[in-house]
Amino acid sequence: MAVPKKRTSMSKKRIRKNIWKKKTYFSIVHSYSLAKSRSFSSGNEHPKPKGFSGQQQQTNK
């Protein structure tokens, strides 16, 4: 006889979601560094991908 599945708890959902987010973040960082190393531009800084948390420059106004 078929038995309904148990509901996944919120904490398990959150843990799995965070693991997925970490994997995607590190793949973005890796692809960005690879693209940066292979670029043949003459000193032009390419824009960083959205969500990249590298060093931020401070502007004084």
Swiss-Prot record:
Location relative to the cell: Plastid, Chloroplast
GO biological process: translation
GO terms under cellular component: chloroplast; large ribosomal subunit
An example Gene Ontology molecular-function term: structural constituent of ribosome
Main location: plastid
SUPFAM superfamilies found in the cross-reference section: Zn-binding ribosomal proteins
Superkingdom to which the source organism belongs: Eukaryota
4Fe-4S is among the record's keywords: no
Keywords: Chloroplast, Plastid, Ribonucleoprotein, Ribosomal protein
Region (Disordered): 37-61
Family: Belongs to the bacterial ribosomal protein bL32 family.
Record's protein name: Large ribosomal subunit protein bL32c
